[in-house]
Amino acid sequence: MAAIMSSYLFRGILMNLRFAQFLKNISSFESRIEKLSDIINYGRLVSINGLILEVVGLNTSIGSECLIERTIDGKNANINAEVIGFSGEKTFLLSFEDIHGIFPGARVFSKIASNSNFFIKKLPLGMELLGRVLDGRGQPLDQLPKIDHKYYSTIKNYSINPLNRTPITEVLDTGIRAINGLLTIGRGQKIGIFSSSGIGKSILLGMIARYTQADIIVIALIGERGREVKDFIENILGLAGLSRSVIIAAPADVSPLLKIKAASYATNIAEYFYKNNKHVLLIMDSLTRYAMAQREISLSLGELPVSKGYPSSIFSKIPNLIERTGIFNKNKGSITSFYTVLTEGEDEQDPVSHLARSVLDGHIMLSRYYADLGHYPAIDIESSISRVMPNIINAKQYSQAFYFKKLVASYQRNRDLINIGAYVSGTDVILDHAIKIWPKLEKFLQQEISEKSDYLFSCEALNKIFI
């Protein structure tokens, strides 16, 4: 009898153990099912036309993300893509990654969000981004852990009521003497830095990032060489600058879609901080690479080029991006933005350069002539202008800055005559004065990388030239 009872007891314990294991397995399966992507809709890849992937049978919205079936070395390695357009039954996608390994008829799955809507990528926002380097999709590039963020946003463009903008009245101290004294910038202004390659653009940007009085700095490195991205972070910006900065990088070798996303994401981050009453400095290097990425996609979609290979849509894309920055009366924060524009030869013939100059609130021109002389920063004062400067400085500084530019222009236009001794003193009063104080003018315009010149000191230095 005892043996029978013992047997029943053993069987009961065994059944309880099996039941507990069964419940554990169910819980495990439920957990694994919850982690599966919500994918219920898929189409088939029928064509690859340049950058564009053409899919049939896919019912999804523009901006939503998809997974494309891919096989590499016999293993599945699906890649992410985004819907950018459609025509009839065809849907057009652009991949975020290299498309090597994609095959005809590959299945293209539409991602579905938890609310059963099409999946649109949400990007991290918040103070946790400071000191981090991310790509255009919010993924870390600095080999640090993923960001545990409280806030997120989708990339979207929207128009801002012009009556919600506040006039620019406050000076922004950039720490650069030539800019503070002669091209004074206001908080909330939009400025372009026009430069060809190799004349100190990155160094000037680094000085602006390090010395400008701003709460938060957002830097978008669009289409730059990978080496330059690392060099800018480590050697030009430095650890002190990085600690109050967010860097969004999309190097030259990534998808044009990622470059566009990076530019928009950086602007989103700047908008988040200004809405939280922060004064934000947004630096985008470069606007030209952003325009080139837009051109690649537009031409692949079949748009016709209208000017220097650029389609007509570029003339709305650039203003849409730039106009999201500024100063607004509903918030105490602001976004002051610097956009670099690459120029080669006659920049007036370049549609991006021409458009940027018309949209921005001023431009700083860098000169190869000055750079070749070892004159840094290589700012061409004659060709540069700050459109809000007359409204934010006193009459004395404005008069001195205007006269300074006249002296420089007169000297540069007669440099050859001066150098060969052909100029006769007394012929031109302005030129006589320029020759007399030229060493002082040159000294004012030049500044070491490690030297900071605040706004008041810059104004004092300008005043001393004419005493």
UniProtKB/Swiss-Prot annotation:
Catalytic activity annotation: ATP + H2O + 4 H(+)(in) = ADP + phosphate + 5 H(+)(out)
Enzyme Commission code(s) on record: 7.1.2.2
NCBIfam families: fliI_yscN
Compartments where located: Cytoplasm
Protein's name in the database: Flagellum-specific ATP synthase
Biological classification of the source: Bacteria, Pseudomonadati, Pseudomonadota, Gammaproteobacteria, Enterobacterales
Protein family (similarity comment): Belongs to the ATPase alpha/beta chains family.
Organism: Buchnera aphidicola subsp. Acyrthosiphon pisum (strain APS)
GO biological process: bacterial-type flagellum organization; protein secretion by the type III secretion system
A Gene Ontology cellular-component term: cytoplasm
Matches recorded under InterPro entries: AAA+_ATPase, ATPase_alpha/beta_chains, ATPase_F1/V1/A1_a/bsu_nucl-bd, ATPase_T3SS_FliI/YscN, P-loop_NTPase, T3SS_ATPase_C
UniProt entry keywords in alphabetical sequence: ATP synthesis, ATP-binding, Bacterial flagellum biogenesis, Bacterial flagellum protein export, Cytoplasm, Hydrogen ion transport, Ion transport, Nucleotide-binding, Protein transport, Translocase, Transport
Binding locations of ATP: 195-202
Single GO MF descriptor: ATP hydrolysis activity
Function per UniProt: Probable catalytic subunit of a protein translocase for flagellum-specific export, or a proton translocase involved in local circuits at the flagellum. May be involved in a specialized protein export pathway that proceeds without signal peptide cleavage.
Membrane-spanning ranges: none
Enzyme class: translocase
